[in-house]
Amino acid sequence: MRLSSSSGSVLPAQAASPEAVEEQKCLNSELWHACAGPLVSLPAVGSRVVYFPQGHSEQVAASTNKEMESQIPNYPNLPPQLICQLHNVTMHADAETDEVYAQMTLQPLSPQELKDPYLPAELGSANKQPTNYFCKTLTASDTSTHGGFSVPRRAAEKVFPPLDFTQQPPAQELIAKDLHGNEWKFRHIFRGQPKRHLLTTGWSVFVSAKRLVAGDSVLFIWNDNNQLLLGIRRANRPQTVMPSSVLSSDSMHIGLLAAAAHAASTNSRFTIFYNPRASPSEFVIPLSKYVKAVYHTRISVGMRFRMLFETEESSVRRYMGTITGISDLDAARWPNSHWRSVKVGWDESTAGERQPRVSLWEIEPLTTFPMYPSPFPLRLKRPWPTGLPSLHGGKDDDLTSSLMWLRDSANPGFQSLNFGGLGMNPWMQPRFDASLLGLQPDMYQTIAATAFQDPTKQVSPTILQFQQPQNIGGRANTLLPSQILQQVQPQFQQQQYLQNINETTIQGHAQSEFLQQQLQRCQSFTEQKPQLQTQQQQQESQQQQQQQSQCMQVPQHQQMQQQKNMTNYQSVPNALSPFSQLSSPSQSSPMTLQTVLPFSQPQSYPDTSMSSLSPSNTSTMHNALRPFSSEAPSHLSMPRPTAVPVPDPWSSKRVAVESLLPSRPQVTSQMEQLDSTAPSIPQSSALAPLPGRGCLVDQDGNSDPQNHLLFGVNIDSQSLLMQGGIPSLQGENDSTAIPYSTSNFLSPLQNDFPLDQTLSSADCLDESGYVPCSQNSDQVINRPPATFVKVYKSGTYGRSLDITRFSSYHELRRELGRLFGLEGQLENPLRSGWQLVFVDREDDVLLVGDDPWQEFVNSVSCIKILSPQEVQQMGKPFELLSSAPGKRLGSSCDDYVSRQESRSLSTGIASVGSVEF
């Protein structure tokens, strides 16, 4: 019965007698896998696997040298692939031949388990693979009784304990254990001409006891416990005569099919035996490996591929081939089966030794087009807004969980199976609908129409005096940082007020109701306009008197110097409210944009008044844009003063605007009044950025008015003040311009004025297109590539690696495998399950190998080695990335802006913050 068990019979679990289990003691996993071969890896206990009855029949046919006869009954209820739970794995070795085989206990999944949206995490530990070993095929001299075993010099120095070369000749005694725990003693000596490593005394006894012949292989392993292990791997010799006590080939085929069909119909456990040396291919593979190959890789006829094969002395080599067809191996008995469904043609002349058909999970296509993104729940490139339905009213769980598995039309079991964690179909991702946020799809067209309807109301740039550069050299700049913070405080309160109303206004408000509310608030604001004008005139007169008295104290040469430096400054009305540009409506229709965005008559401003709060005299375009701004003017673009040395970014930004800000009481009083009458407008109703920041920017610094036409209105790019939601028009190439935002003033006030948590998360709208970049953003983008890159792996210390030493991904993977003891596993992630990911300069986590090599070298920040368990655990959102030391989600404006600027990527709809391993 021993041969029948090892050759692949199927037994019910309850019928597994003690005779079938030859050894109760646990075998060494390293030695067992070394004897099985470098391409063999048993699935972990507790994991989900896919069992192929076709492959099991091939093992029986290879062991008995007899194919399955046609008269064997068919089992229509047995699917071509059976998804099972692996309950137990026992490694065995034949006591006489040392032939290794494994006993597996499987149980088909129930219909309820097939509907689980997530693949459970693998609880069992992976079988240990050998790392420090060598294998040699025996020659005729190695098996002779009067000779010894010649060990290659490099292998002896790598595996055997070091010799004492002070002795003559250097020699030592080695004690090695085989699979059954038997100890074998050998004398290791370094002698001969030329000198070589030999095993002499005890070797002939071992060869005779194991009945080794030329062509068999012997392998030695030095494990972590400083023990020497010994194993053998016999050459494949087909048996010509089968023992009479062994079951016939037909009986074995019928037995395995009947047991599998019974287990599939009753959801009962059954036991199989897997012989890795006799089976042509693995017929029990992990479910994740099967899904990745079948549903995540698209192949076609004519595509080139490569496949791993075992060669002499336990080495591995890739052979190239071409896909010549895709069809069922046995369409009559096993329709719609993925077992050996790919016809291939091999390049080399020795192709006759290889199978003409292979399975999808055995090959590695050279040019692959993934059907889904990579199986990692990374960050979304475009975060989904908070509070909105995912797919126009669909359930959020349908998108936050991963996409349901692609259905198999021929298998009812696969039709109900959902596979989670392997990404989202790109064409299934939701398209953002502006109507959900209360935005009109033709908002830009409406604004353009209002600007061209009445050419007489188009204002010349000369009328917009607050946009023109003014000579303010005679004004004193005595504002302190505390005064600046007090000025910004009302703006921040107003912004926070609008953010709080966003959640209640964004749901259930129709567009007509929103416009009517705007109209009512605009009218109430217009009624308060005379009072604001009276206060403005009083404050202007007081400000003029103070400025005249202060100018008398400033030396004349300082005034000239200030006048020279400040000539190019743009005058900025820092306290302008989004609704300060509105006047009385000229029409009464609440459904037209002209009612909400009326025209105002041009007025002139005094030269000494920089930031008046009277109704603005801006162009129609400004009147149209300002009411839709969701925050106070905070993004200013202005030159940096060259006469004042500043040591830090805060000082540079403070000094740059100190001379342009009005006095504190004026701004504070005006903003308090505006804050009390601030209309309740959803923040999400702000206009999206105008396409292309460079289209309105004169990069050469020229002030050609024709280059600044916006909807028929001349706009000077150097003096234009852009409110929140519109990018700065300052030229990017201007070295004296600094990006300026409210976050730079609010950094000391983070504890007193925290941002709304909805903005602090990564689930809010992506404003990377219209939120100005922070001051250090250009430094990050233009930063030179680092020479040394940190490499991380769970359970080990991180290593620094100079990636400039390598010229290809293959060299990098090979070096990483050597550093972390993963030789041969990082080169083929499809088979081993180990994955390499890296974090680029923009904090995106990407797969190593997807980009051109030079682009990868220039953008890599750090590298992370993920084990197969980590790859499978990443199928659940936040599970692995949240455990990594990442950037903490703060509540400051700087953190918010930097998060919005960072690009994000994810396969699931759930988004996380910036990731740093």
Curated annotation (Swiss-Prot):
The keyword Manganese does not apply. CDD domains: B3_DNA. Residues 786-870 form the PB1 domain. The keyword Mitochondrion does not apply. Keywords: Auxin signaling pathway, DNA-binding, Nucleus, Transcription, Transcription regulation. SUPFAM superfamilies: CAD & PB1 domains (SSF54277), DNA-binding pseudobarrel domain (SSF101936). Disulfide bonds: none annotated. Residues 576-594, 604-620 have a biased composition (Low complexity). This is Auxin response factor 17. The gene is ARF17.
